[in-house]
Amino acid sequence: MKSFPIFINLIHKPVLVIGGGDVALRKIEMLLKADAKITVIASSLCKELKHYQKLKKIHVKIKSFEKNDLTHPVLVIAATDNKKVNLLVSKTAQALNIPVNVVDEPSLCTFTMGSIIDRSPLLIAISSEGN
């Protein structure tokens, strides 16, 4: 076992998601179920994320990621198709001891998220440890 399975309480906790496409959407929808306080940084948003923004379920900054964007999130998710941005997000978060997940890049992650089966009150996460 290379990773320790853990469930984290994100209720009203700040989470930063970098990216505004379909991959980011999937992560954000899971974070919304966890009642996290989500900030999204992206150059553009998919239709569904614009809808969540309109409903004030997410806070959005239409801009490029910068190192100083990492102010107090409890975790960070990079969900962009830009390898340089993903690497910068990972290095910056790790330097600040903020847990970071870079989608589809396990070598840049300090945590991974398993596949989830939610049959409330039963919640099951399954992982191949990034493989």
What do the PLM-derived regions correspond to, one by one?
Residues Q53, I58, V89-A93:
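A generic structural signal for well-ordered alpha-helical segments
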Residues I38, V60, P99-V100:
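Hydrophobic beta-strand scaffold residues
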Residues H12, T71-P73, R119:
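Alpha-helix C-terminal capping/helix-to-coil transition sites in glycosyltransferase folds
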Residues L75-D81, N86-F111:
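ADP-ribose/adenylate-binding Rossmann-like module
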Residues M1-Y52:
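Hydrophobic, well-ordered beta-alpha structural blocks that scaffold small-molecule cofactor pockets
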Residues K54-T71:
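Glycine-rich, highly charged phosphate/nucleotide-binding loops
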Residues I116-N131:
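Adenosine-phosphate binding glycine-rich loop
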Residues A42, V60-S64, D104:
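Short loop/edge segments at beta-strand edges and connector loops
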